[in-house]
Swiss-Prot record:
<protein>
    <recommendedName>
        <fullName>RNA interference defective protein 11</fullName>
    </recommendedName>
</protein>
<keyword id="KW-0678">Repressor</keyword>
<keyword id="KW-0943">RNA-mediated gene silencing</keyword>
<keyword id="KW-0810">Translation regulation</keyword>
<keyword id="KW-0862">Zinc</keyword>
<comment type="subunit">
    <text>Interacts (via RING-type zinc finger domain) with rde-10.</text>
</comment>
<keyword id="KW-0863">Zinc-finger</keyword>
<dbReference type="GO" id="GO:0031047">
    <property type="term" value="P:regulatory ncRNA-mediated gene silencing"/>
</dbReference>
<dbReference type="InterPro" id="IPR017907">
    <property type="entry name" value="Znf_RING_CS"/>
</dbReference>
<dbReference type="InterPro" id="IPR001841">
    <property type="entry name" value="Znf_RING"/>
</dbReference>
<keyword id="KW-0479">Metal-binding</keyword>
<comment type="function">
    <text>In complex with rde-10, required in the endogenous and exogenous siRNA pathway for biogenesis and accumulation of secondary small interfering RNA (siRNA) intermediates, such as 22G-siRNAs derived from ergo-1 targets.</text>
</comment>
<feature type="zinc finger region" description="RING-type; degenerate">
    <location>
        <begin position="183"/>
        <end position="218"/>
    </location>
</feature>
<dbReference type="InterPro" id="IPR013083">
    <property type="entry name" value="Znf_RING/FYVE/PHD"/>
</dbReference>
<dbReference type="GO" id="GO:0006417">
    <property type="term" value="P:regulation of translation"/>
</dbReference>
<dbReference type="GO" id="GO:0008270">
    <property type="term" value="F:zinc ion binding"/>
</dbReference>
<dbReference type="GO" id="GO:0031332">
    <property type="term" value="C:RNAi effector complex"/>
</dbReference>
Length: 316
């Protein structure tokens, strides 16, 4: 799934927080799902300072622009102190996970949602009775999951992607982690990324001060709105391939989902002057929360990292 780190205002001390930038409400109602699961997997030992939260946010604004303080301070806690021993453990170990299940009545979405959780820790592995979540006050609102942890410390997967990950582990087919997606102006910027029509990648923070300048790498004029990249986590959704350190992957247009697939990248290079058959073969975005019709393909280019900078597998 698409996990982003929100920007904080100047002078504010950033705290660990990230946003799962896939609208849970849209994922369920548009796809007519009655049940949707999210796995939050911890890649390091982490001490959670507070519960996960659910936040309604207006559709008219890009969630990538949501201030980190708002993401941290607002929203509905998914569990409280009153849950006592039934609440997920706040002390997490590497490879632990918390599974979140969401339910809705597709014939009457006005009834809202219900949700429950399951903690993989043996003493806590009890799924709660589903809790009701009221629908948004306006139809334009979207529902996001807020996590009180640094983006680099977790992997957030749909149930399908989690199953693919377990299959890869079973066959020991994990491969080398792909490169970190770095902004050409500020490599260490943690905010979400965008791609210009030329394929070069920048962060949202630098984009805000762009002022109609040409791309700083190729000097081509910026003639259209940049594509918001969705750097999804998990295995390759097409063939569970293992990308190498030179893999750039392919961005699907218009959804902006980045597919870290070496085989797709190779097919793109072979057919880049006649991509229509490849686009028709893909047809729809393969990621479960998206599934938007693919109209174009674009190979992205980002600032190369130093060897010590690596992230875990980004792709679903």
């Amino acid at each position: 799934m698409n996990v982003i780190t929100p920007p904080f205002a100047d002078g504010v001390d950033p705290k660990p927080v990230c946003i799962v930038a896939d609208d849970i409400f849209e994922t369920m109602t548009a796809r007519r799902k009655i049940h949707f699961s999210i796995y939050v997997i911890f890649k390091k030992n982490v001490e959670l300072a507070e519960p996960f939260k659910l936040l309604y946010y207006t559709e008219k604004k890009n969630v990538a622009h949501l201030d980190g303080s708002v993401a941290q301070d607002f929203g509905l806690p998914m569990w409280t102190k009153d849950d006592g021993q039934r609440a997920p453990d706040l002390s997490r170990q590497k490879n632990d996970y918390i599974k979140l299940d969401f339910f809705t009545n597709i014939n009457n979405p006005e009834d809202g949602f219900s949700y429950c959780w399951t903690d993989c820790i043996s003493t806590k592995n009890t799924t709660m009775v589903p809790r009701q979540l009221m629908p948004p006050s306006k139809r334009s609102m979207k529902l996001y999951l807020i996590l009180p942890v640094e983006e680099s410390n977790i992997m957030v997967l749909s149930e399908k992607a989690y199953g693919s990950l377990q299959l890869m582990k079973k066959h020991r087919k994990m491969g080398q982690p792909p490169q970190r997606v770095g902004c050409y102006i500020n490599f260490n910027c943690q905010t979400s990324k965008v791609m210009f029509g030329c394929g070069h990648v920048y962060c949202e923070q630098c984009l805000n001060s762009w002022n109609d300048k040409p791309c700083s790498v190729c000097l081509k004029p910026v003639t259209s709105e940049p594509t918001q990249l969705k750097l999804r986590q998990g295995p390759c959704p097409f063939d569970l391939c293992s990308p190498n350190s030179s893999t750039m992957g392919i961005v699907l247009i218009p959804c902006g989902c980045h597919v870290m697939c070496q085989n797709l990248e190779d097919a793109y290079e072979r057919n880049k002057h006649h991509l229509e058959p490849l686009i028709e073969k893909i047809k729809y975005c393969p990621f479960e929360p998206c599934r938007i019709r693919v109209r174009k393909l674009k190979k992205p280019f980002w600032h190369q990292q130093d060897k010590e900078h690596t992230l875990e597998m980004n792709s679903a």
